[in-house]
Amino acid sequence: MNTANNTLPTAADWAGEDGAPDAADTRKIERESHKLEKRLCREVGRAITDFNMIEEGDKIMVCMSGGKDSYTLLDILRKLQKRAPVKFDIVAVNLDQKQPGFPEHVLPDYFKSIGVQYHIENQDTYSVVKRVVPEGKTTCSLCSRLRRAILYKVADDLGCTKLALGHHRDDIVATLMLNMFYGGRMKGMPPKLVSDDGKHVVIRPLCYVPEKDTARWAQYQQFPIIPCNLCGSQDGLQRVAVNEMLREWDKKFPGRIESMLRAMGHVVTTHLMDPHLHDFKNAKATGIADPNGDMAFDHEEFPVAPALPGLQVVQLG
């Protein structure tokens, strides 16, 4: 455990079907589940370390929607809590927005079954949104703002130092693409940020985790999933289209989504076009060699993407 002299913990410190399956199938499922658990703990631990998400004495408010991602986040954080190099508390929080058909017993029953501290906040934002937003318009934007304000207040009331959200790797890359395609800006989801009111720290411990892993873990653990579209509103067709594009891309070109995520952490501001990040107007030749300077006329070489299985070209002779 690497906590001496206020040294930040390392990633190693953190990561310390139908019908009844037969014995062989059961063993295979157990092996796959164990491997996935280790991978999830490793990736979440790495994110916590890389961005100093959780510190000694923190009280983490895990925002629970009842979807696969928030269940996975809570489960993995509780596993890490038992062997983490720092001591921290967890409280699971759900905002019941009084959407018609919301199964309000599901989350409290689950929280009680695992013995986690929890809080259910009852606020009828559904009626507010329906009253304010014209019929046929998406309610997601207003609903999100109301939810954010309420959760910040709950964090204050509970004495929480951090709010943990369940956004995963694919959410972050999709948001970057959405902003590029429809917003004309390069903006994704940060792994850690100070809230817009300046009073709260928000963390995304699943930022390195692909969605397929949270889906698989939810399946293994048989979490009581609550549908995400009870209100009948959808967050526009743009996100649906981008998510589908990324899924197809990942099938055809494995590893590209991971590469895009890495790119968000390796930004070369001199090779973009934002004058606020680089002073292009006053760029002048100095006569001094710069190893980081632009090779303006050179063709940039990129690593060859791995071919899909079965598509490799075999050369004979």
UniProtKB/Swiss-Prot annotation:
Binds 1 [4Fe-4S] cluster per subunit. The cluster is chelated by three Cys residues, the fourth Fe has a free coordination site that may bind a sulfur atom transferred from the persulfide of IscS. It is an enzyme of class 2 (transferase). The keyword Transport does not apply. Its cofactor is Mg(2+); [4Fe-4S] cluster. InterPro entries: Rossmann-like_a/b/a_fold (IPR014729), TilS/TtcA_N (IPR011063), tRNA_Cyd_32_2_STrfase (IPR012089). One of its GO terms (biological process) is tRNA thio-modification. Keywords: 4Fe-4S, ATP-binding, Cytoplasm, Iron, Iron-sulfur, Magnesium, Metal-binding, Nucleotide-binding, RNA-binding, Transferase, tRNA processing, tRNA-binding. It comes from the Bacteria. Belongs to the TtcA family. This is tRNA-cytidine(32) 2-sulfurtransferase.
